[in-house]
């Protein structure tokens, strides 16, 4: 039996402010929200532009991302909005950090979301050293969670790790075991 309440937050994962509003109405609150370029691309405004044959440049995508995040920001609580950088396996820590610095200025409650890769962790460490709030995503193992802890150690701001429980479950692993192990390791 649990004797203390965990410091757990409810964060919406999406890119449509109207969905955030609906959920907030349904449950009465939303602590925060996570976004990423893929979720933003599914936003109805973006989808309408694409359906009309408009191809967005990276700069236009970034501007739309910023507008959407700025609309979501006042709808959520203290856990803020996690804004994921545009990245792939070839994106360097320096490139991610530069994006993160810009994105961190978009809203007052920004958390910059980096992938749990070697380069993503390097970017997160540098971000923390510059006083930025971070959320490390795509965490699939306790070893990765330990690397997140090492990269964010000493931060004065909250730092989040986003374990991918559902994907672990999809491949036949027990995702909840990862959560239990992370909680025990961080305790």
Region roles according to the model:
Residues 5-22, 26-30, 35-129:
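Active-site beta->alpha loop and helix N-cap motifs at the rims of alpha/beta catalytic domains
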């Amino acid at each position: 039996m649990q004797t203390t309440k965990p410091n757990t937050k409810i964060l919406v994962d999406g890119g449509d402010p109207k969905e955030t509003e609906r959920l907030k109405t349904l449950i009465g609150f939303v602590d925060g929200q996570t976004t990423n370029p893929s979720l933003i691309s599914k936003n109805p405004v973006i989808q309408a532009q694409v359906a009309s044959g408009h191809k967005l440049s990276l700069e236009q995508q970034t501007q739309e991302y910023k507008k959407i995040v700025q609309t979501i920001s006042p709808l959520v609580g203290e856990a803020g909005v996690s804004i994921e950088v545009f990245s792939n396996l070839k994106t360097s820590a320096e490139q991610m950090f530069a994006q993160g610095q810009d994105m961190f200025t978009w809203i007052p409650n920004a958390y910059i979301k980096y992938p749990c890769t070697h380069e993503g962790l390097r970017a997160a460490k540098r971000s923390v050293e510059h006083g930025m709030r971070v959320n490390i995503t795509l965490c699939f193992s306790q070893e990765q969670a330990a690397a997140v802890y090492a990269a964010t150690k000493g931060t004065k701001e909250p730092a989040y790790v986003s374990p991918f429980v559902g994907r672990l479950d999809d491949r036949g692993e027990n995702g909840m075991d990862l959560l239990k192990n992370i909680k025990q390791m961080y305790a």
